[in-house]
Amino acid sequence: AYLPDFSFFMDGGENAVAKSKESVEYSILGAADAVSKLSPDFIAFQEVDLDGTRSYHINQFELLQSEFTEYSSNYAVDYDSAFLAYPIFEPHGKNKACLATFSCFEMDSALRRSLPISTSFTKVLDLDRCYSIVRIPVENGKELCLYNVHLTAYGGNDEVRKGQLSMLYNDMETDYKAGNYVI
């Protein structure tokens, strides 16, 4: 939901909130347009705001649904911050975001899996990390398993990252060994 000149505070930049409500809508609709031109069977988005100070309280998931009306969709909340008071002069604020998965095939089920996160102070930047597994039935009786993943990007340590990758790998391997197709 950010324009190219946005410099995100977590990457050493200065911005925590989009420039305007219009810039959020422009960015989301632009991303949707770029993706739709590819005519994908599946789409996986991360950092999709359901509500948030940083995105002027625009429900980006609903905005994407309005652009991909022929797709079934699902979301899993992966960030729910009551209020992040940083940066001091333009706080990130209250935000709730998700992983959003879209499919041109009907989804049979979806599961949200919570990932291990840091227990240190950095966990305020890393709330609710997860992945979602969407299951789509296949004609041979197996399932196509779509994994939409958002691992720890900031804070944490190697042990947390290894734990996240191990959990993800184990779930993917279980699906694969069951004869399912894993993406």
Feature locations, PLM:
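Short hydrophobic/aromatic beta-strand or adjacent loop that forms the aromatic wall/cage
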Residues: 96-99, 127-133
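Short Pro/Gly-enriched beta-strand edge/turn motifs at strand-loop
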Residues: 83-85, 112-119
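Conserved beta strand-loop-helix elements of the APE1-like EEP
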Residues: 65-69, 93-110, 137
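Active-site-proximal beta-strand/loop segments in catalytic clefts of secreted hydrolases
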Residues: 1, 46-48, 76-79, 105, ...
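Surface-exposed cleft-lining segments at the edges of enzyme active sites
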Residues: 14-20, 48-52, 115-124, 150-159
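N-terminal, active-site-proximal structural segment of metallo-dependent hydrolase catalytic domains
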Residues: 1-96, 142
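His/acidic metal-ligating clusters that form di-metal
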Residues: 130-147, 159-183
